[in-house]
Amino acid sequence: MLNTLIVGASGYAGAELVTCVNRHPHMNITALTVSAQSNDAGKLISDLHPQLKGIVDLPLQPMSDISEFSPGVDVVFLATAHEVSHDLAPQFLDAGCVVFDLSGAFRVNDATFYEKYYGFTHQYPELLEQAAYGLAEWCGNKLKEANLIAVPGCYPTAAQLALKPLIDADLLDLNQWPVINATSGVSGAGRKAAISNSFCEVSLQPYGVFTHRHQPEIATHLGADVIFTPHLGNFPRGILETITCRLKPGVTQAQVAQALQQAYAHKPLVRLYDKGVPALKNVVGLPFCDIGFAVQGEHLIIVATEDNLLKGAAAQAVQCANIRFGYAETQSLI
């Protein structure tokens, strides 16, 4: 049994982690923590997230020193802000824990990236070298030996799962950059109250145009430039990405289908559509990424959907943990 600590459990992704870990037959929750300054410290997780009432009624304990919680812990999930994960991950690693970080603090092996896109100076270049990028379907072998796993961002997960098989099969004309138009539910902005995320204010609107930090994450791990425009949708959760690409001359629809099938035939958390494209409602509350596509001449449109809190965060983190410790990838997820 893996003793498991969830840090930052009060947020939306944190609550999903609690759900997944609680029903995992090989994991035991030792504690749920929040920062010592959090207004949620001392509250029950089930008071903040009533879907957990009668299932997990543990308190959210304030954490100011990891030594209060790290002894005997095997696994730590960090559902914390980027700067917080940056500071906590090395401490838990030194304490002998395997760390799964849901923030962006260790996703890109380039210290200058964090100054430009995250606004802080990265102090641990050696950990950037060591961290395994947790795109579970593609990086499984690296995960098996890693002690620090950087769980990908929500948008990058869907984008890479859709595009990587086609790039690796050399089917795309990358002189025309793939264009990713992505829409996420409001939960992607976190649980903290903000006027812009309130019911009467939120609308379908692009944001972070040409400046969003997920663009370089996608491009770095694909090894190809992309144009990425995120949108905030007026619904609670889920991501839908419509990706427009140009195929190389002579590439057929059958070749696109074959590349996707070969990539995901034995990957249970990616579901491919033989016909049509996926709808968001079919992945909300589930750990899958659904992918469909259409071809017209040299033009390809791929649609990928996922739950941003599950396949885009908590479920993928647990999927990575399953791979790391040799369990079935879908353990506790489906």
UniProtKB/Swiss-Prot annotation:
GO MF annotation: an example: NAD binding
Compartment(s) of residence: Cytoplasm
InterPro entries linked to this entry: AGPR_AS (IPR023013), AGPR_type-1 (IPR000706), NAD(P)-bd_dom_sf (IPR036291), NAGSA_dehydrogenase (IPR050085), Semialdehyde_DH_NAD-bd (IPR000534)
EC number(s) from the headed UniProt entry: 1.2.1.38
Catalytic reactions on record: N-acetyl-L-glutamate 5-semialdehyde + phosphate + NADP(+) = N-acetyl-L-glutamyl 5-phosphate + NADPH + H(+)
Domain of life, source organism: Bacteria
Pfam family of the protein (one): Semialdhyde_dh
Record GO biological process: L-arginine biosynthetic process
SMART domains the record matches: Semialdhyde_dh (SM00859)
Major localization listed first in the record, in broad terms: cytoplasm
Keywords recorded for this protein, A-Z: Amino-acid biosynthesis, Arginine biosynthesis, Cytoplasm, NADP, Oxidoreductase
Entry annotation: catalytic residues: 154
GO annotation, cellular component aspect: cytoplasm
The protein's annotated pathway: Amino-acid biosynthesis; L-arginine biosynthesis; N(2)-acetyl-L-ornithine from L-glutamate: step 3/4
Function: Catalyzes the NADPH-dependent reduction of N-acetyl-5-glutamyl phosphate to yield N-acetyl-L-glutamate 5-semialdehyde.
The family this protein is said to belong to: Belongs to the NAGSA dehydrogenase family. Type 1 subfamily.
The protein's name in its UniProt record: N-acetyl-gamma-glutamyl-phosphate reductase
Organism of origin: Escherichia coli O157:H7
Name of the encoding gene: argC
